[in-house]
Amino acid sequence: MRLKIVRASGEETLHEITPSIEYAFELYAKKGFYRAFSEDMKMSDVYWLAWECLRKDGVTVPTFGATFIDTLAKVEVVGEDDNPNS
């Protein structure tokens, strides 16, 4: 599973959801990663994953919340076979 993140500036990046990001998500959300995305998917969870991916990649981001979300134009969950440029 990967995230395609499009920032408000137009910058697009693609991020792998690594085991450490899954673990951080489960601590944050208090629910299992795969269950959250198969049965109870919320966009706020996707935005949190985008925040964590950017943060883990060394990008300086605001504290998670509305200020961070305002820096996003679009976030998509993409599979391994999906074309990230579509």
Language model: regions and residue ranges:
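Charged interaction scaffolds used for protein-protein
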Residues: 1-14, 19-86
